[in-house]
Amino acid sequence: LRCELDRLLRVAHPKAFPYIAIIDVANTCNLRCPYCPTGRRQSSGRNKIFIELDTVRRMLDDVGKYLVSVNLFNWGEPLLNPKIPEIVELIHSRGIWTVLSTNLSINNKKVLEDLCDAGLDFMFVSISGSSQETYEEYHRGGKLDLVLENIRHIIQYRRDNNSKNPIVELKYLVFKHNEREIEAAKKMAQEVGVDLFRCVHAGGPEWAESELGRGQALLGRLFGAERCKQLWQALVLNSDGGLAPCCYLYFKEDDFAEYNGNDIAEVRQNEKFVLARKLFDASAIRDLPTDLRHPCLKCTLVHEQPHLREYLKENPEAVRGHRTGDA
């Protein structure tokens, strides 16, 4: 509650600690999704592909008591990390909810069973079509039949072990080119036995032209600009131990700090974090340097804040780009 109050009041120096952790356990992927920098094989500048188990353990020792859930995904495919079952088991042993998002186009039934045994609570499985032809237009290199086979295997393994976990949600990434297959995908989800089915916008150039994209744009105009939540709610840890302010910053150069077993609470009070929070507080605009150089100045959320319009016009560093920081 204190964390949410700090967020609503846009407190620059929050007293409460984030209750969500986002850990990028694998900075690599087996697919080549065109709107993802990892899929495009764009270097993030990081020297470690997989996060180390000891790094996760140190983080939990430091802040685990505050965490409600840990999302074990961000820029890569988490199932490629050979330690992923151990990471899930470690977090689960602390009584923390574990969430994983995967393309599930991977030929490894053993890791699926190990994740179930480790106590994984929730699994998102992303697809972008009900036919292979449509699916592979975005999920390049993926095999839809393999994804569905793996889902069936997880569901059957749950039944065999009298377990309801992990809860499996089939997440349909919506683009203009695949809206026509949404209904077929819903039926497919029922047939394979997933617990939940959901359509989500996929971003990218096509998103603004899709029906869902136009609907979200209208909501934004009606209810005002969205403000950042992750600066208060989330702890974001990259595969090499870099600490980011949110899950949208991809490049190493945009990290706010390094985690080497140091005090995370203290790190989150450094100048970069404080200035980022002040960007969303209209009363703190006078505290912002006129020539501020900051990764958040590329963020679409920052550029949508009414109180920053004049400030951003006058700052040559404030070039609007993608929320990954890719201008």
Question: Where are these predicted regions, by residue range?
Answer:
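Conserved C-terminal portion of the radical SAM core fold
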Residues: K65-F73, S93-S101, D117-G129, D145-R214, ...
